[in-house]
């Protein structure tokens, strides 16, 4: 199994699956994009991986990176001989699998990623989406009752660590808000924008 990870969240999404597959005797090869803390997380979980691609800003650089990642993953897959390739919103695994006559399984939960989905879906063998995903990708689509985050935050897999609050100088009953800022440079951000009003 070859799994390509393009985002830190993908490490969390796939980690339990990888451990389960390895327990069952499967060999899993991870390729990973150097984006934010993706490589650090893989190292923290003691996963071996091959870095492919690096985050750069701008649409042209994104397309250029996709082409280069396709070529890198193609070379790696030719040497590894996976039975199938997996990723999240990942055109490279779909393209490479098609070129090598292998199967690809792509997860996505981002309907508005029209460009990324448009260059991925036609080549993917299986497209897994949450049941709330309105877009109909045709007979290749498998809908599941859940969300990506349940792959790593489900109570069977996750126990909160209250020590984290202490590190932040918070008590368990303190109210707090988490705000995530983004650059709007990701493939699923093409044609999107954030809050335009000055706050």
Which stretches of residues belong to each language-model region?
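Nucleotide-activated donor-dependent transferases that construct or modify glycoconjugates
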Residues: 1-8, 187
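Conserved nucleotide-sugar phosphate-binding/catalytic loop shared by glycosyltransferases and other
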Residues: 5, 22-66
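Short amphipathic alpha-helix
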Residues: 8-22
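Glycosyltransferases and closely related glycan-assembly transferases
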Residues: 44, 74-85, 91-105, 119
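Short beta->alpha connector loops at strand-helix junctions that form conserved
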Residues: 51-55, 107-111, 130-131
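An amphipathic, basic-hydrophobic alpha-helix
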Residues: 59-81
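A conserved, positively charged/aromatic
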Residues: 105-107, 114-129
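A nucleotide-sugar donor-handling region in carbohydrate enzymes
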Residues: 128-194
């Amino acid at each position: 199994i070859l799994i390509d990870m393009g985002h830190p969240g993908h490490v969390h999404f796939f980690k339990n699956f990888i451990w389960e597959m390895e327990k069952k005797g499967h060999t899993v090869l991870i390729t990973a994009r150097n984006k934010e803390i993706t490589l650090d997380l893989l190292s923290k979980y003691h996963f071996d991986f091959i870095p492919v691609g690096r985050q750069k800003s701008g649409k042209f650089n994104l397309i250029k990176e996709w082409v280069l990642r396709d070529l890198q993953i193609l070379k790696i897959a030719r040497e590894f001989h996976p039975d199938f390739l997996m990723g999240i919103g990942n055109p490279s695994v779909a393209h490479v699998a098609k070129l090598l006559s292998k199967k690809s399984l792509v997860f996505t939960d981002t309907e508005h990623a029209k460009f990324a989905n448009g260059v991925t879906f036609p080549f993917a063998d299986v497209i897994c989406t949450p049941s709330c995903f309105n877009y109909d990708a045709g007979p290749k689509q498998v809908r599941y009752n859940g969300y990506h985050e349940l792959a790593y935050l489900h109570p069977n897999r996750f126990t909160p660590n209250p020590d984290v609050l202490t590190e932040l100088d918070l008590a368990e009953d303190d109210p707090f808000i988490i705000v995530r800022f983004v650059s709007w440079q990701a493939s699923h951000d093409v044609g999107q924008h954030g809050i335009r009003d000055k706050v």
